[in-house]
Structure formats: C-alpha cells, structure tokens
Amino acid sequence: MARFSIVFAAAGVLLLVAMAPVSEASTTTIITTIIEENPYGRGRTESGCYQQMEEAEMLNHCGMYLMKNLGERSQVSPRMREEDHKQLCCMQLKNLDEKCMCPAIMMMLNEPMWIRMRDQVMSMAHNLPIECNLMSQPCQM
C-alpha cells in the first residue's frame, strides 16, 4: 500500500510539473496606435473640417454670396443683399479653424450644384478668406 502511495505521489508531482507551464497563462495586450496624417497642418483633419463645415451650415451664405456675384439671382434668397451674404459668409468662415477654411471652401465647391459653375466661381472662392480679412493669402485650390 505504501508503494502505491509513493507511485501516486510521484505521478502527482510529475503531473504538477507538466501542467505548470499551462497554468502560467500569460496575457498579451496589443496596443495599436493609428496616426492620421493631416495634410492641412496642425488642428483637425479633413473629416474634422467637414464636421466644422456642417456646423457652419455647409457655408451656405458663402455659396449665396458667390451665386449673387455670378448673377444667379433666381436661386438665391431675394430678400438678402449680396453684402449681407458676404458678412454672414465671413462669420461662417471665422467659426472654422484657420486650417479648415480652404478645405471647407473646396468641399463646398465639390457639391453637385457647383459643377456647372465651378470654373467661373473658383477664382472668387479662393479669395473668400482674404475678402473676410481672415487670411493674407488666397486658398490654393
């Protein structure tokens, strides 16, 4: 009987030694960092600019100001003067991060309604931040 006890004890020790690596389960945590490249310098990325642009009502007054400059009066609020739209446009642009002004204007011009007028309006649009005294250089579009 003592012999069986020694055999069982030895088997138990071997079993514990064999299971030791299994019971020492290690946990590996992988941390992934995504660095989003921002082509517009510091501040928010283009998607952040789009969010700001949405908050600025898609620069609707800038669009109306540009349309009035083109003589597109039928599509624009007849009650507001061109100068009123310009002032409101400047307020909308001022609410954007400086790095988002030009990308937001470009996003506005990528809207379907601007496709047929894009060439005509491009030169006026890239000067909007200058007209509003918000930047010293025109937007590079």
Curated annotation (Swiss-Prot):
It holds the Pfam family Tryp_alpha_amyl. InterPro entries: Bifun_inhib/LTP/seed_sf, Bifunc_inhib/LTP/seed_store, Napin/2SS/CON. Residues 26-38 form a propeptide. GO terms for molecular function: nutrient reservoir activity. Disulfide bonds join 49-100, 62-89, 90-132, 102-139. Keywords: Disulfide bond, Seed storage protein, Signal, Storage protein. Gene3D superfamilies: Plant lipid-transfer and hydrophobic proteins (1.10.110.10). Transmembrane segments: none annotated. Residues 1-25 form the signal peptide. This is a 2S seed storage protein. Heterodimer; disulfide-linked. Belongs to the 2S seed storage albumins family. This is Albumin-8. It comes from Helianthus annuus.
